[in-house]
Amino acid sequence: MGQLEESSELTLDFTKLEKVGKQVSDTRAAGGAEHDPGVIPVAVQNADTKEVILVAYTNEFAMKESFAKKKLILWSTSRNKLWFKGETSGETFDLLEAYVNCEQNSLLYIVRPCRGGICHTKNAAGAPRNCYYRKIDFETLKLTNVNP
């Protein structure tokens, strides 16, 4: 586990979308990837608990794969390839519904976990967490782990 995932310090990456945009631009300038790397954000919500468990990205190909397979399939902006959620961890998700926002520039996927959590981090009991397991203190900007 990295320092970023366990830290109580707030270290937000406000350049993430800039990096993603540059990656898309560079890929297109180089002749394009097998599939267009243009992406939009996807909020992923647990159908049963209503928790937002992840915010990630999809491109058109990943979205269509998700819809066809009824599974959570995303686009990895760090690896620039399809991300079959749970392919290595076994933490897969059934895709139950999909919604688009008013400007049609982001999606909401309603999913049901097939086993448990979604995040690569684990709590003290060894169970996978959801990605939003740290709460920000408004005064100090310190993080508190709500699922230690």
Regions found by a protein language model. Name each.
Residues 2-39, 46-148:
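C-terminal binding/interaction regions
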